[in-house]
Swiss-Prot record:
This is Uroporphyrinogen decarboxylase. The gene is hemE. It is an enzyme of class 4 (lyase). It comes from Nitrosomonas eutropha (strain DSM 101675 / C91 / Nm57). Pfam families: URO-D. The keyword Glycoprotein does not apply.
Amino acid sequence: MTRLENDTFIRALLRQPVDYTPVWMMRQAGRYLPEYNQTRARAGDFLALCKNPALATEVTLQPLDRFPLDAAILFSDILTIPDAMGLGLYFSTGEGPRFERPLREEREIHSLIVPDPGTHLRYVMDAVTEIRKALNNRVPLIGFSGSPFTLACYMVEGASSNDYRQIKTMLYTRPDLLHHILEVTAQAVIVYLNAQIEAGAQAVMIFDSWGGALSHAAYQEFSLRYMTQIMEGLKREHDSERIPNILFTKGGGLWLESIMASGCDAIGLDWTIDIGEARRRTQDKVALQGNLDPAVLFSSPEAIAAEVGKILASYGHGHGHVFNLGHGISQFTPPENAKTLVETVHMQSVHYHQVS
């Protein structure tokens, strides 16, 4: 058992009393920080940075050295699993991630195997271990994975997509093939996240970035079903410590009750739903994470403080809230505005945790 200097984030996820609302930011180690860009240049490219545990550790800690954040998140990419499956991940300048061998043929789909994280994804586990050591129990470390459906989107489309034409065609014409991809990928995510926990991750998060593109029925069948499988297979305790988990579907505000039923400890919210409404609907049975529009960070300190105040007031008194953005921080965000966000959350939230 290790004693964290700051366990506010873990306590909030477990809906335990805290003195203030903890805060971290999705993509907090990223291109908006000059020091990140310098480290990335040393690595050569983004993928080389992800696969170098020493440099991944360096960039993971950079935002914590600037801001009083309450958690660190592993610096990696959601597409490590399909890359380890042999699809050939690469990054094109200005185009984002792409796969050399997207899944289009039935034979390729049925040959998918669950990669061994101890061999094919060793660099991720080494990074988790190194980051934990470098953090020296300052704050907890979050591990993560993409959701099966979001990973499948990239695996079938071969890249980002505006219309999801390839995967939705498969969904409606050959659902059996898509279910096979999702089944294998769900098992891979379980093994991958449990390996991260064994290596030192103290909480884990599933990013369902593209689940919100599905219809109501399709979301239940092709996204949430497999995330529920993951919830059932995840380690909930390691070294006598609870390992909480967060499930985030971008555009998932329609399905909060169903997401809660998956068995997750916390639901991540994007900025399109009022957090107070989300709290009423989930009845304090799960923690909530979110949900500032990242574009607010392009505005003034006064506007940032006002928008933070609205979210804190909407959530209201009591525990179970982790403040975050509703999606990843933009590369164009002034770092001083991120600092304003973190400090404002800490300062304004104390009021909501005081016992009257």
